[in-house]
């Protein structure tokens, strides 16, 4: 079952003003709580939308639906996806494990605890938070320090905020589904 293809179908239906009803047999397989993010990229790998549900608060089929619609139509960095763009974009879905807070005595320990290619991160301080998926540092060629710094930036905080003991760092893993 390719979740990226289901995400595309959800968006295709929405562009027609319709609600895609995920078939019951698929819903049954996706009826456990999990976070999910949908990433939409152009064929030349430029980001076109990426949003999702980081925490396991909905059944996966519902997180998938929400994330697909948000990535296509609500990502504030981009205008809503148009029907004419569908042939020129590809969908990717990342299913997230529940985020786990990293406990450290010294923030420099984060550099050892975060595994590039395995972990995604959530940076939190006060009302601010930013999430980066596990595939991002690989795509960007970042090390753990850069990953943390860009996580801070994504949260709207200074790039060195991860060095502040008041900043919380969470890690999660992701299973990635891509279109063929």
From Swiss-Prot:
One Pfam family in the UniProt entry: AMMECR1
Domain of life: Archaea
AMMECR1 domain segment(s): 1-180
PANTHER family named among the record's database cross-references: AMME SYNDROME CANDIDATE GENE 1 PROTEIN (PTHR13016:SF0), AMMECR1 HOMOLOG (PTHR13016)
The protein, known as: Protein NEQ441
Native organism: Nanoarchaeum equitans (strain Kin4-M)
